[in-house]
From Swiss-Prot:
Belongs to the baculoviridae 19 kDa protein family. This is Per os infectivity factor 4. Its main location: virion. The lineage of its organism: Viruses, Viruses incertae sedis, Naldaviricetes, Lefavirales, Baculoviridae. GO terms for cellular component: host cell cytoplasm; host cell nucleus; membrane; virion membrane. Residues 1-21 form the signal peptide. Per os factor that plays an essential role in the initiation of host midgut infection. May form a specific complex with PIF1, PIF2 and P74 to bind host receptors. It comes from the Viruses. It is found in: Virion membrane; Host cytoplasm; Host nucleus. It comes from Autographa californica nuclear polyhedrosis virus (AcMNPV). Pfam families: Baculo_19. Keywords: Host cytoplasm, Host nucleus, Membrane, Signal, Virion.
Length: 173
């Protein structure tokens, strides 16, 4: 009877040892940890915003390129245009933009409905125009880091950040 009990204890000890050793020395453990580490590192980057400014004293004209999402915002004469990716859905043969002005922001806050418009001017055309005139060098580059809690990392948060800090001009004179 004692030998059976010792055999059971020995088998349990061996099983526990195997479970612990497999957990600590899993053949894919290093690859799994590397994948998780890489994923966590990509979440810590945040975003950066390239600002091209062609403003004059009479009017505001700025282009914002938000990376890594490649979102294009265009601020012209107290209106911010946000180029949407779903251009062909809303506007056949044209490009869809959401417009932000003081009045449309109030409407968005009250109803949750965004004002969209169609335009024949593509975001690529705007980028080429500004990059050519500025020799492909932005006037400012903002680095918004998630670690410092500057943004919560959604496009609307970045738009709010740009408006709040005065990069986007929506105020009527």
């Amino acid at each position: 009877m004692l030998s059976i009990m010792l055999a059971i204890v020995f088998v349990l000890f061996v099983l526990i040892y195997l479970i612990i050793s497999i957990k600590n020395h899993h053949p894919f453990l290093h690859r799994i940890e590397t994948l998780i580490q890489d994923f966590n590192n990509t979440l810590l980057f945040g975003a950066y915003v390239q600002i091209y400014d062609l403003s004059t004293p009479a009017r505001t004209e700025r282009l914002f390129i938000i990376a890594p999402e490649n979102v294009v915002l265009y601020n012209f004469n107290k209106t911010l245009y946000y180029y949407l990716d779903s251009a062909n859905v809303f506007c056949p043969n044209e490009f869809s933009v959401t417009t932000f002005t003081q009045s449309t922001i109030k409407t968005i806050n009250e109803t949750g409905i965004y004002a969209t418009a169609c335009t024949p001017v593509s975001s690529l055309t705007l980028i080429e125009h500004f990059a050519t005139l500025k020799n492909n060098v932005p006037d400012h580059t903002l680095v918004l880091d998630v670690v410092d809690q500057q943004i919560q990392f959604s496009i609307l948060d970045i738009i709010n950040y740009l408006i709040y800090n005065g990069y986007v001009d929506l105020l009527a004179e």
